[in-house]
Each structure stands twice: as C-alpha cells, then as structure tokens.
Amino acid sequence: MLGDIDQAALDDAVEILRADGIDAHGVRCDVRKLDDVSHLADEAFRVFGEVHVVFNNAGIAYAGPIVETSHDDWRFVIDVDLWGPIHGVEAFLPRLIAQGGESHIVFTSSFAGLIPNVGLGPYCVAKYGVVALAETLAREVRPNGIGVSVLCPMIVETNLLANTERVRSEDYGPAHSDAQSVQQLASPPDDDSVLNVEDVARLTVEAILANRLYVLPHRAARDSIRRRFDRIDRTFDDQAAEGWEH
C-alpha cells in the first residue's frame, strides 16, 4: 500500500509495481493531515488484513538562516518532516500492537538529524525530532515484538527540491528558503558521496531484517558523528576541571 500527495506519481508507482507482479495499491495521502494517514491505515488493513512494515518516508527541504526563517517556513517544514512521522505512528502503531506478531516501523530522517548544518535550522530541528521519535519508540515497543529503524542518509538521488516546491501550498505563504542552498541539497555534485535510491533501499531492508535501529548509508558521516559525541563527552571533563561536582 503506497501513500502519496501527488496522485499522478502515486498512480505511476502503483503501475510499475503491478507490472512486476506485485499486488500494489495506492491512496492519496497528505501526511500533514492525521485523517489522511488514518485513512491510509484503514485501507492497508482492509486490503491486506495485516501490516508488517510501515515506512514513514515523506519529506521536504528548507534552507536559509534561522533569522530569515518565517513562522510559515517553520510550520511547513515541521508539518511535513516531523508531524508526518508522528501521524504515521498515531495511525498505525495501535493496530500493529493489536494484531500481534512481529512488525517494523521505519522512519526517514537525515544526516542532518544527527549533525546540525548551518542554514538548515528548521530541517535539522525536524529531522532531530524524527531520530528522537525513533529512538524512544524503539525502546517502548520492543516488548511488543515491533522493531524500529531510522534512516539517516547524507545525499541520495531523489526529487527533494521538486517535491518541496510542489507540496508547499498557499496556507504557508511565499517561501523564504534560499533556493540555491536547497538546490545544492537536492542536487549535489556528482561524486562518491551520492548514493542511488536502490542501494539505500537495499541497506534499509537489511536493517529491517536485522532489527537494526540506525541505518547509516554514508561511511563519510562516521567522523562527524564521532566528533559530535566526543565534544559532548569532553564537556563532563571540562566542567569537572572547573569544579563542578554533581
């Protein structure tokens, strides 16, 4: 069962899957709306009886200094990139618990959900929230036999920029995003750090099968992640050296 706000793209995806012999169905879904995501869940359980993997993948991008970010910009990013996954949990989790057996919930976050980036304030806030949601949920639902994974890629070949422009509606007013920065985020230089969707999907499936919480496709992210946690750890020593004893 696929959900997408873009009906044409949804129809194309369903057609491609059916051509490969997959029993695919699609429901138009705006993840900003809990009713839409709940309807998607209704249809998934109606058609298939059970659901074993839920993939919260919808996302948009925003770039620009925080001081230049409007309230509507904040709402737009948080509504899609954070409320979307929350709505996915609200709509599917109670039913996964009720059906029993093993199942898995996957969230797409970002490298920006682990390491903050200048000029990506709202995006980082949302993606950090997704990581926290996944980490907390993983601990809570483990006794229910439900696994959780959070995908934190750096750069993947997707239609991120086009999706952002298409999804933003008049409800959020004119965009204040730095178009050039978003373009760089969505269409980075062609080098070894850019992964294709198929490779990332394969790694994600492996994480589901292994019940692995973190999915980290880019080895280049490792040093940055280590430095961040080293800085946090050193703070305890710095404070102790200054006389803090608690």
Where are these regions (language model features)?
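Substrate-binding pocket helix/loop in short-chain dehydrogenase/reductase
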Residues: P65-I66, D73-R75
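SDR active-site lid
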Residues: P143-V215
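Residue(s) in the substrate-gating loop at a strand-loop-helix junction
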Residues: S110
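Active-site helix of classical SDR
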Residues: V89, A126
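Active-site-adjacent segment of SDR/Rossmann-fold oxidoreductases
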Residues: I115, T136-I146
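Conserved glycine-rich Rossmann-like NAD(P)H-binding loop of the short-chain dehydrogenase/reductase
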Residues: M1-D12
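The beta1-alpha1 cofactor-binding region of Rossmann-like NAD(H)/NADP(H)-dependent oxidoreductases
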Residues: Q7-A8, V27-H39, H71
